[in-house]
């Protein structure tokens, strides 16, 4: 499947007044095709005036198998979530730990996870004094020598009490790229920053140039997404920066893969920069 055939994430939250049981630590595993998935529960959290419950989807893979990030690159299928049937749920936000780039076996490159992964969820209950029942139909793909689709149907009752999987969820959340501003230096302790984004013409091709600042000698990768899921931008490739400042990395990619009728002018790109010690996310406008 090419990047132009990528399906978007579907997140559907349903609400119910039906009372649910007390919280659990994890659902049963649902597995097939060299992979299995389950829901896990953590403790309650709060951001500003919003109270939420920590949960996650844990995916276990056989050795040598892999699965995909929200944007899978040149080939692959991102996970999809259908939360229809959940009870006492106002909203659900899926978080994505930092992925890595790997060869897709067909001459292209994909983005995903080379091994087990936990995808954190933040669940906002309709009534925070009551448990919430989380139901999800998960669709995803797993790849070894061949790629196969996988599905799981999972349910778990969540409460505000910390469960046995709290530390696993916190560790997964720590790997989620943090949003920072374009051009920021050492914001909130981050070692990475996206310094500039601009377009340039190279012969008949228009391309995007991104400069990333990082500690000298530390490997860095960069991924680019468009404003909607039907954008299929190529993976940025590293190149030698015009500025020889220590730690400055330059990435380029052709301005290709736009959906029919879409215009690059003014489009907001989401850029994810990753190193062994940091992961950040930056929004940048193409002017």
What are these regions (language model features)?
Residues 1-4:
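Positively charged n-region of N-terminal signal peptides that target proteins for export
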Residues 7-17:
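Bacterial N-terminal signal peptides
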Residues 22-287:
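Extracellular/lumen-exposed scaffold segments
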């Amino acid at each position: 499947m090419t990047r132009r055939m990528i399906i978007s994430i579907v997140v559907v939250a349903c609400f119910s007044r039906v009372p649910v049981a007390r919280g659990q630590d994890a659902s049963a595993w649902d597995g097939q095709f060299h992979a299995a998935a389950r829901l896990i529960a953590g403790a309650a959290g709060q951001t500003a005036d919003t109270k939420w419950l920590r949960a996650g989807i844990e995916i276990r893979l056989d050795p040598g198998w892999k699965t995909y990030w929200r944007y899978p690159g040149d080939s692959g299928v991102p996970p999809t979530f259908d939360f229809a049937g959940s009870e006492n749920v106002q909203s659900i936000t899926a978080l994505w730990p930092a992925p890595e780039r790997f060869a897709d076996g067909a001459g292209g490159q994909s983005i995903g996870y080379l091994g087990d992964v936990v995808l954190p969820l933040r669940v906002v209950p309709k009534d925070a004094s009551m448990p919430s029942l989380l139901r999800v139909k998960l669709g995803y793909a797993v790849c070894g020598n061949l790629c196969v689709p996988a599905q799981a149907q999972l349910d778990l009752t969540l409460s505000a009490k910390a469960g046995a999987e709290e530390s696993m969820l916190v560790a997964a959340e720590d790997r989620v790229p943090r949003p920072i501003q374009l051009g920021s230096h050492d914001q909130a302790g981050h070692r990475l920053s996206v310094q500039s984004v601009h377009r340039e013409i190279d012969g008949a091709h228009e391309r995007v140039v991104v400069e990333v600042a990082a500690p000298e000698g530390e490997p860095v990768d960069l991924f680019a997404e468009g404003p909607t899921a039907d954008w299929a931008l190529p993976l940025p490739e590293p190149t030698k920066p015009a500025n020889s400042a220590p730690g400055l990395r330059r990435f380029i990619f052709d301005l290709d893969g736009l959906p029919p009728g879409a215009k690059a002018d003014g489009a907001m790109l989401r850029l994810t920069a990753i190193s062994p010690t940091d992961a950040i996310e930056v929004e940048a406008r193409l002017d």
